């Protein structure tokens, strides 16, 4: 029993010396630290300019098409495929956590001519010549309020919610698309490379249901309209600069 007690005392003594030595080293390191050289990025009052490129994922399902008179009707399907685009944005920080981002984008969605041919078959002129594929252009102006979850250090995630108005345009044969507007959700992260330079990864979900109108050269003298559930998801990567 006495032997065990002696061993315990030896262990405690050695442990005490080790802890004291470790604590002294930490204290010395704190004293010697140069905080002026430590990377520390402050958001408050700054402006952030970003440029991004990305891919677009859209469903483009149509709703509200009128009842057709075709005996051998075919499924209309989606009117557009996935696409690509880019945007430029300016972010102003009200404090380290809250910011507002204003962005202007230019996006391209590829039309599915099988859908246009199906509309022509069901409602109007069969075997219509559709010509070359013409895309749908989406030009959104977006204002987003952001909350920066961890605003210090080199990695800064954020979330946001806002509103967009999108100018829609296409030169596709027999198709006209109206402008749209709705809410947009956002999540992203900034990777700071230097004090004023960063890499940005951003995901935005646009909610958008523009109105489609089919022209007489596709459907004859009938009035055929529908709502398309576009709801594009835009995944982007880009660079940014603070001012």
Swiss-Prot record:
Compartment(s) of residence: Cell outer membrane
Protein family: Belongs to the OmpW/AlkL family.
InterPro entries: OMP/PagP_b-brl, OMPW
Alphabetic keyword roster: Cell outer membrane, Membrane, Signal, Transmembrane, Transmembrane beta strand
Gene Ontology BP annotations: transmembrane transport
Gene3D superfamilies xref list: 2.40.160.20
Principal localisation: membrane
First and last residue of the signal peptide: 1-23
Name by which UniProt lists this protein: Putative outer membrane protein RP075
Gene Ontology cellular-component annotations: cell outer membrane
Pfam families for the chain: OmpW (PF03922)
Highest classification ranks of the organism: Bacteria, Pseudomonadati, Pseudomonadota, Alphaproteobacteria, Rickettsiales
């Amino acid at each position: 029993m006495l032997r065990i007690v002696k061993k315990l005392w030896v262990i405690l003594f050695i442990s005490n010396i080790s802890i004291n030595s470790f604590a002294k080293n930490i204290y010395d390191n704190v004293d010697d630290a140069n905080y002026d050289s430590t990377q520390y990025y402050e958001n408050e009052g700054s402006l952030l300019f970003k440029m991004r490129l990305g891919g677009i994922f859209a469903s483009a399902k149509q709703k509200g098409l009128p009842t057709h008179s075709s005996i051998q009707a075919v499924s209309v399907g989606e009117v557009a495929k996935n696409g690509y685009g880019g945007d430029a944005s300016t972010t102003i920080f009200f404090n380290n956590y809250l910011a507002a981002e204003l962005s202007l984008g230019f996006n391209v969605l590829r039309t599915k001519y099988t859908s246009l041919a199906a509309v022509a078959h069901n409602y109007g002129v069969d075997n219509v010549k559709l010509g070359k594929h013409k895309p749908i252009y989406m030009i959104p102006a977006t204002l987003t309020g952001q909350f920066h979850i961890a605003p210090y250090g080199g990695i800064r995630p954020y979330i946001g919610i806002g509103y967009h108005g999108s100018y829609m345009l296409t030169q596709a044969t027999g198709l006209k698309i109206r402008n749209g507007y709705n809410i947009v959700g956002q999540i992203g992260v900034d990777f700071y490379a230097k004090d004023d330079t960063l890499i940005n990864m951003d995901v935005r979900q646009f909610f958008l249901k523009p109105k489609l109108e089919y022209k007489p050269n596709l459907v004859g003298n009938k009035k055929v309209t529908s709502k398309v559930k576009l709801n594009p998801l835009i995944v982007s990567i880009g660079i940014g600069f603070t001012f």
